[in-house]
């Protein structure tokens, strides 16, 4: 296998292990803006396998998330195996910074 192919395969494996949790609420304009940027970022071909979970902090079953982030949404957790704590993005999202974090190796 060529070195380029090996790098692409390794990057693909890294991206498959990235999981995202997007904490939001329906009445939040910042959340809507962040969601648009997140969706646009995830449309890139190399992010097609990234897992995204959206958590509406206003739903009763998400009360722990509400207690933690009621004044801080939107919040995005970037998790991957071997990482002790998620990387967090809060309030304003930047497409280039998100993409760089999704591609980062731990």
Question: Could you describe each region identified by the protein language model?
Answer:
Residues 38, 48-50, 79, 93:
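Non-catalytic interaction surface on structured domains
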Residues 33-36, 64, 68:
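Generic recognition of short, well-ordered alpha-helical segments
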Residues 47-62:
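Thiol-based oxidoreductase modules, predominantly thioredoxin-like and allied folds used
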Residues 67-77:
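Structural micro-motif
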Residues 2-18, 104-106:
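N-terminal leader/targeting and pre-domain segments
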Residues 10-46:
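Local sequence-structure signature of Cys/Sec-based thiol-disulfide redox active-site neighborhoods
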Residues 78-106:
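Non-catalytic, surface beta->alpha helical segment in thiol-disulfide oxidoreductase systems
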């Amino acid at each position: 296998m060529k070195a380029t192919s090996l790098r692409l395969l390794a990057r693909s494996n890294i991206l498959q292990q990235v999981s995202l949790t997007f904490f939001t609420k329906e009445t939040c304009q910042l959340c809507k803006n962040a969601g648009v940027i997140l969706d646009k970022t995830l449309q890139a071909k190399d992010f097609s396998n990234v897992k995204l979970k959206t958590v509406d902090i206003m739903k009763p079953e998400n009360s722990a998330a509400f207690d933690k982030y009621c004044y801080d949404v939107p919040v995005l957790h970037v998790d991957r195996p071997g990482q002790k704590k998620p990387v967090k993005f809060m309030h304003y999202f930047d497409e280039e910074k998100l993409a760089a974090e999704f591609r980062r190796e731990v």
